[in-house]
């Protein structure tokens, strides 16, 4: 209704501001530790069934980033020197001479899919360092990569992840806002292009039905008893879990191995910088400005070399005075 009248837009804007205010602006300052001047979250190893870390009290993996107002909340997160003990309220400038450093895996789930499926087209795309979503769009629309428009690339990205996680024509049509028949055509073209991915997904489901569980790269198991359920709805949900878990669980394996190796190297190198947060596929550190270059190289090497895969891992580095600036 937003395009039809200003009132619905105003209501939605108010809800966004009210949510940001109640969840973050009014709440987080009261959670700052009185002695350290910092927020101290808990990271939970055994909450998410995929093996990913979750965060609580407060949840620092859920700080908004997708809207301009949400990014203003991230601007409040600033670095502080190790050992800072002065009392400091939230939402004030950080320690002078210190910065935040973000290290974010690029397309980690698609890269893991390429490794697990051994699909030639996907493996080649990552090996050549090309834009996988643009390459998919080129194949789906039958046009040269340089002719792919941004809307076409965005559609291809949605198809890449939709098919990866078992989305059918109806769900993809709703996501893209296109007719179901067109979505079915996209899915059919994707399956023809990436036959190795489809074969891997079929093998994964077959093995899950046989064994009752699926495994990650490091052989962690997730049991999925509902995959043998007599209920079609329960079975369909279990099949989605069987497809999701090896990908998301392997991503969790990868970043945890990287974190352990990074911690070892930080201690061995006597860096003043340190790891602060893990936010899904991203690590956030703080360090003195004069350590940035060395630390960025160390972090990238530890993350990209955490596990040996058939495709290269790529880590994007960002540096800034606050959490908003590093993206």
Label each residue range with its predicted role.
Residues 1-327:
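Conserved catalytic core of nucleotide polymerization and phosphodiester-bond processing enzymes
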């Amino acid at each position: 209704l937003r395009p039809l009248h200003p009132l619905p837009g105003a209501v939605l804007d108010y809800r966004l501001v009210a949510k940001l205010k109640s969840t973050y602006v009014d709440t987080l300052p009261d959670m700052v530790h009185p002695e350290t001047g910092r927020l101290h979250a808990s990271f939970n190893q055994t909450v998410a069934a995929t093996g990913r870390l979750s965060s609580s009290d407060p949840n620092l993996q859920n700080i908004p980033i997708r809207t301009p107002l949400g990014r203003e909340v991230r601007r409040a997160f600033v670095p502080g020197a190790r050992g800072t003990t002065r009392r400091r309220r939230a939402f004030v400038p950080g320690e002078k001479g210190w910065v935040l450093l973000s290290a974010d895996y690029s397309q980690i789930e698609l890269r893991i899919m390429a490794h697990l499926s051994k699909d030639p087209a996907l493996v080649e795309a990552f090996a050549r360092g090309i834009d996988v979503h643009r390459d998919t769009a080129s194949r789906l629309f039958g046009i040269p990569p340089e002719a792919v428009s941004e809307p076409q690339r965005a559609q291809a990205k949605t198809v890449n992840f939709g098919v990866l996680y078992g989305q059918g024509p109806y769900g993809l049509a709703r996501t893209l806002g296109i007719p179901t028949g067109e979505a079915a055509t996209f899915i059919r073209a994707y399956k023809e292009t990436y036959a190795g991915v489809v074969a891997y997904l079929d093998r994964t489901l077959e093995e899950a039905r046989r064994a009752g569980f699926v495994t990650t790269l490091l052989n962690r198991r997730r049991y999925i008893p509902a995959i043998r359920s007599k209920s079609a709805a329960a079975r369909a949900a279990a099949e989605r879990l069987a497809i999701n878990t090896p990908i998301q669980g392997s991503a969790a394996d990868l970043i945890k191995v990287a974190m352990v190796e990074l911690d070892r190297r930080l201690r061995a190198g006597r860096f003043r910088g340190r790891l602060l947060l893990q936010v899904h596929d991203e690590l956030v550190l703080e360090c003195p400005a004069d350590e940035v270059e060395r630390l960025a190289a160390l972090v990238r090497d530890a993350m990209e070399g955490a596990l040996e895969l058939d495709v290269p891992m790529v880590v994007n580095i960002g540096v800034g005075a606050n959490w908003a600036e590093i993206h």
